């Protein structure tokens, strides 16, 4: 391994924040991770950089996962099992499965990032999470010096959470995900639980949608609501939808009857962070070069020339506004480096 030095990381994060890595290595094969000298390095594992806030320079080795490949591993009477390399673009992979007649991931169309990063955050949208379709994750464990396969049930998936985050492996670089296997059930049913998707399909006069129809609807809705990172730098949804106790949700609903709320299996209630931010006066508002997007208050955008410190200032201001108005704490989704 022969890493580059003092590498500009601006092109490698979708918020286009400045920062440099002391050492940078693009990884295109799992074997590259077995180099003995990597064990003692301070490491950070980078995917698509779409869930990352750079707060300055990184004084270690940044491993940029770019392992390619996608294939049908096996098929049985109930499902297809498809493997993809960690470096595969997530949206491109989803569309590839659909063109081959393997439905199941269509609601996750157009989410930025890579396949390898998807399980870490347990990405989700429009009524579907990666955990719903994931079979197993394979990754290199730098401590054990071994390639591990972690089954879905051992990944401890939760809302925007997983074993990889709970153990801090996404921060300390202990495990580098190299590939993911998905289980796509043959007994497919369209997932139209979200009103935006159902409305888009109705507008297109599609009563019995295919998986590709769902994907097309999701893409259309996302393109209308969310900024393209290539044009307006952003990291997608910036805050988790907060989950509160039922008694607090009821009190808030009494005061704000239009508050969107979603009962959870454990009896608590999930609230819509975007709605809270908008009602707190932050939709389309900025603090210096960083603000909340005018079409979707949940998305934080870099309006030009922002730094990680600018992002942190705006984040804190939004959190304070929501806390003051609703007594609800917002937690950021991205990783801070």
UniProtKB/Swiss-Prot annotation:
The active site is at residues 160, 237, 333. Pfam families: FAD_binding_4 (PF01565), MurB_C (PF02873). It is found in: Cytoplasm. It comes from the Bacteria. InterPro entries: FAD-bd_PCMH, FAD-bd_PCMH-like_sf, FAD-bd_PCMH_sub1, FAD-bd_PCMH_sub2, MurB, MurB_C, MurB_C_sf, Oxid_FAD_bind_N. It catalyses: UDP-N-acetyl-alpha-D-muramate + NADP(+) = UDP-N-acetyl-3-O-(1-carboxyvinyl)-alpha-D-glucosamine + NADPH + H(+). NCBIfam families: murB, PRK00046.1, PRK13903.1. This is UDP-N-acetylenolpyruvoylglucosamine reductase. It comes from Dechloromonas aromatica (strain RCB). The lineage of its organism: Bacteria, Pseudomonadati, Pseudomonadota, Betaproteobacteria, Rhodocyclales.
């Amino acid at each position: 391994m022969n890493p580059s030095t003092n590498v500009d990381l601006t092109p490698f994060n979708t918020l286009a924040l400045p920062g440099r890595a002391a050492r940078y290595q693009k990884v295109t094969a799992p074997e590259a991770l077995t180099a003995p000298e990597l064990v003692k390095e301070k490491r950070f594992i980078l995917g698509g950089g779409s869930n990352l806030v750079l707060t300055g320079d990184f004084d270690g080795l940044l491993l940029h996962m770019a392992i390619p490949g996608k294939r049908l591993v096996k098929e049985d009477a109930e499902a297809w099992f498809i493997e993809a390399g960690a470096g595969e673009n997530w949206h491109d992979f989803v569309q590839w499965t659909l063109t081959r007649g393997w439905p199941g991931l269509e609601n996750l169309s157009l989410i930025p990032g890579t396949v390898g990063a998807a399980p870490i955050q347990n990405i989700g949208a429009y009524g579907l999470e990666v955990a719903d379709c994931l079979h197993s994750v394979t990754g290199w464990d730098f401590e054990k010096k071994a390639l591990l396969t972690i089954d879905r049930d051992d990944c401890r998936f939760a809302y925007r959470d997983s074993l990889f985050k709970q153990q801090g492996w996404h921060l300390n670089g202990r495990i580098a995900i190299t590939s993911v296997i998905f289980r796509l059930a043959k007994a497919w049913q369209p997932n139209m639980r979200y009103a935006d998707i159902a409305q888009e399909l109705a507008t297109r006069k599609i009563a019995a949608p295919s998986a590709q129809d769902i994907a097309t609807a999701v893409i259309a809705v996302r393109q209308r609501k969310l900024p393209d990172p290539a044009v307006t730098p952003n990291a997608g949804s910036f805050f988790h939808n907060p989950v509160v106790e039922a008694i607090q949700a009821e009190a808030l609903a009494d005061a704000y009857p239009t508050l969107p709320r979603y009962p959870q299996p454990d009896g608590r209630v999930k609230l819509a962070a975007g709605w809270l931010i908008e009602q707190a006066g932050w939709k389309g508002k900025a603090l210096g070069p960083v603000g909340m997007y005018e079409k979707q208050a949940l998305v934080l955008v870099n309006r030009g020339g922002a730094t990680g410190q600018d992002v942190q200032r705006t984040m804190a201001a939004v959190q304070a506004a929501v806390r003051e108005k609703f007594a609800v704490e917002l937690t950021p989704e991205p990783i801070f480096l």
